[in-house]
């Protein structure tokens, strides 16, 4: 999964 910062740039799924 992607880290929280990567999620902000559209990376999915996000780590929780």
Swiss-Prot record:
What is any one of the record's Gene Ontology cellular component terms? extracellular region
Task: Look up the domain of life of the source.
Answer: Eukaryota
Tissue note: Expressed by the venom duct.
Which GO molecular function, any one, fits this protein according to its record? toxin activity
Entry keyword ATP-binding: no
Q: Where in the cell is it found?
A: Secreted
Instruction: Give a yes or no for keyword Disulfide bond in this entry.
Output: yes
TM region(s), chain numbering: none
Disulfide bridge partners, by residue number: 1-15, 2-11, 7-14
Alphabetically ordered keywords of this record? Disulfide bond, Secreted, Toxin
What UniProt notes about the protein's domains is: The cysteine framework is III (CC-C-C-CC).
User: Which family does the record assign?
Assistant: Belongs to the conotoxin M superfamily.
Q: What is this protein called?
A: Conotoxin ar3d
Q: Which organism is it from?
A: Conus araneosus
């Amino acid at each position: 999964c992607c880290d929280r910062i990567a999620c902000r740039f559209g990376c999915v799924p996000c780590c929780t």
